[in-house]
Amino acid sequence: MKMIDKIAADLCLDRDYIFSVVKRSQFYYRDYYIYKRDGGKRQISQPSSELKTLQYWVKNNILSKLPISSSAYAYQKGASIKKHAYFHKNSKYIFHTDICNFFPSISYEHLQPILQDNSKLFENLNIDFDSVETVRDICYRENKLCIGAVSSPIISNIIMYKFDVLMLDYCKKNGLKYSRYADDIYLSSCSYIDRSHVCFLSSLLNKFGFRINTKKTYFSSPKYRRKVTGLVIGTDYSVTIGTEKRKLIKKLVYDKLIHNKGDSNSILGYLAFLKDIEPHTYNNIIAKYSQYCTEDIIEALSK
């Protein structure tokens, strides 16, 4: 059967209605912009509830069955920036770069051959493979992945699978650790990371249709602050949130409890983040500022 018929049957929705959403999917997005750290803007394209439902179906029934590398630390169950940082924490030298314009650079031509190689999936779902382009219509907009679509993160990991495997194999042969967190790529080692390794990485990325973002490329060592996905690795190889964020959290808690200034949800989010990365610091803050409360500090902040 056609994929649209399968989706209609599984979701108990009218087939013609789904057909209409799929064929006009480009118009089922709401666009808005958020500011980036460098002052630029990032477009977010939020799919409507109708299209999002179809994207979830594709994600759960097709995309989730495709291989993803263990070197990919984002968008997976159980993944976290903490686990990612701990993977590199014992390395003396760290190299970081990111991929230019990552999601919008991922076209359907990246995904189509992978779906072709896994055509058995469609057979198991009793779906005619000749209707595979319905995946494109549901998950892509103008042949690009959208930041905001529920299917985009997993597709990005899927299409990077072969790249991750090749990079991991190369790094193992050269005494390096390799990981990727979305569009952030890290190499680390206990010895100096030669630029030839970076050249290999850049060349391989180019073969997959991507480019290194030179503005966000850097080397770090114990002489300089080493950071992995926002977390700081100390000279004692501990993983922390860093002095600046620690001071910020203390100030936010103080201002809220003493002057009733600040957003409670934001502060609670910061505290949850701190508790996960630095539980001892979290406990110290709770103990210190509890003197200003006659009730549990978390309950006080929740009001």
Language-model features: locations:
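Long, hydrophobic, amphipathic alpha-helical segments used as structural scaffolds
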Residues: L66, S70, C171-Y178
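Catalytic palm active-site di-aspartate
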Residues: H96-C100, G148, S152, K173-S189
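Right-hand nucleic-acid polymerase module
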Residues: M1-Y35, K41-A149, I158-Y161, V165, ...
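"…together with the soluble PPM/PP2C metallo-phosphatase catalytic core" -> "…together
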Residues: I155
